[in-house]
């Protein structure tokens, strides 16, 4: 049951309209301090079993994994991305009026941070989740037999967000809208089109804009809208990760703390049959792609799935001789 303060907060949010400071209804004023969520996002150790992680994802749509990456790795990421932080934090809303002002966005992180690329290449939890949730196994029916075609998942986008004081909150939304995904209450966890992994580069709190999440919304009907009086707030320590399904309603919170910057690395994955949000073929320097493991080349779409024809070049798997293909392209 929502308490009277929460009801009052909801009423205030409903009647308060975006003013001239907010350029579009995709970016909104903060939720009043008087609102207190009814639920907290579940936290478990990153060493938890895959079964436990999947059970919480199935129930809530998202889960916090503590100590997901080391502080040393985060320090190295900061060092690698430092040259890309010279740009001033945006004074205007960007990315189609969906990334708020006072937010610095660093795109294409695989090509800019070897540490992030290594996390993607070696993290066993991410690897297991990709196989269970997004690996596509399809029974292809031929005239006289049936074959199982396997399509590997892809890295859809990899971005860093440095969110400064005054950055507005996002309207509640689902990430899989970019794929025109349709939702059903009975969707199974291995039927969603994607999932995300937020890495906390700083301590994340409600006050500095921790993501608003509606637990259980991954099981809603497609047309149901999220309301501010339904949200919980993402709060986690540096090094933790928030794993959530692309069907979960959420939105970045409002950073209310002067002088504080919230840092998030956003790793988003999708089915290999979908178009990625970020064009990895043009985001990652060829010098780095050529040195990557087959697993990373697969995740970025440079390697043809073993059980499919997707991604061919000259009727072949491009990963057989990527260097020769690059040379031919440059002629």
From Swiss-Prot:
GO molecular function: dioxygenase activity; metal ion binding
Organism in which the protein naturally occurs: Metarhizium robertsii (strain ARSEF 23 / ATCC MYA-3075)
UniProt pathway: Mycotoxin biosynthesis
Disulfide bonds: none
Positions of Fe cation binding: 173, 175, 250
PANTHER family xrefs: PHYTANOYL-COA DIOXYGENASE DOMAIN CONTAINING 1, PHYTANOYL-COA DIOXYGENASE FAMILY PROTEIN
Residue ranges of the region described as Disordered: 1-31
Source species taxonomy: Eukaryota, Fungi, Dikarya, Ascomycota, Pezizomycotina
Biased composition (Basic and acidic residues): 13-23
Function: Dioxygenase; part of the gene cluster that mediates the biosynthesis of swainsonine (SW), a cytotoxic fungal alkaloid and a potential cancer therapy drug. Swainsonine production occurs via a multibranched pathway and is dispensable for fungal colonization of plants and infection of insect hosts. The first step of swainsonine biosynthesis is the production of the precursor pipecolic acid (PA) via conversion of L-lysine (Lys) to 1-piperideine-6-carboxylate (P6C) by the aminotransferase swnA, the latter being further reduced to PA by the reductase swnR.
Enzyme Commission (EC) number: 1.14.11.-
Disruption phenotype: Abolishes the production of swainsonine as well as of the 1,2-dihydroxyindolizine epimers intermediates.
Keywords per UniProt: Dioxygenase, Iron, Metal-binding, Oxidoreductase
Comp. bias (Polar residues): 1-11
Subunit-level organization: Homodimer.
Protein name (database record): Dioxygenase swnH2
The family this protein is said to belong to: Belongs to the PhyH family.
């Amino acid at each position: 049951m929502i308490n009277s303060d929460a009801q009052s907060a909801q009423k205030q949010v409903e009647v308060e309209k975006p003013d001239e400071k907010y350029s579009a209804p995709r970016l909104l004023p903060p939720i009043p301090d008087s609102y207190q969520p009814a639920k907290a996002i579940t936290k478990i150790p990153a060493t938890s079993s895959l079964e436990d992680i999947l059970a919480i994802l199935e129930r809530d749509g998202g889960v916090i994994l503590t100590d997901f990456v080391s502080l040393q790795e985060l320090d190295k990421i900061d060092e690698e991305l430092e040259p890309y932080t010279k740009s001033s934090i945006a004074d205007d809303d960007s990315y189609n009026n969906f990334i708020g002002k006072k937010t610095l966005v660093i795109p294409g992180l695989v090509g800019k941070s070897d540490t992030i690329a290594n996390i993607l290449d070696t993290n066993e939890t991410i690897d297991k989740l990709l196989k269970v949730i997004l690996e596509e196994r399809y029974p292809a029916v031929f005239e006289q037999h049936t074959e199982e075609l396997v399509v590997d998942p892809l890295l859809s986008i990899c971005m860093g967000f440095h969110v400064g004081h005054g950055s507005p909150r996002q309207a509640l939304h689902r990430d899989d809208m970019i794929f025109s995904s349709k939702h059903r209450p009975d969707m199974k966890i291995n039927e969603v089109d994607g999932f995300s992994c937020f890495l906390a580069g700083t301590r994340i709190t409600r006050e500095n804009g921790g993501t608003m999440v509606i637990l259980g919304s991954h099981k809603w009907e497609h047309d149901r809208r999220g309301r501010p009086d339904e949200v919980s707030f993402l709060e986690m320590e540096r090094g933790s990760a928030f794993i959530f399904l692309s069907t979960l309603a959420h939105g970045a919170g409002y950073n209310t703390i002067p002088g504080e910057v919230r840092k998030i690395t956003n790793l988003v994955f999708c089915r290999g049959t979908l178009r990625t949000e970020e064009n990895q073929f043009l985001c990652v320097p060829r010098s780095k792609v050529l040195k990557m493991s087959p697993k990373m080349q697969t995740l970025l779409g440079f390697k043809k799935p073993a059980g499919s024809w997707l991604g061919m070049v000259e009727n072949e798997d491009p990963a057989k001789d990527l260097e020769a293909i690059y040379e031919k392209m440059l002629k």
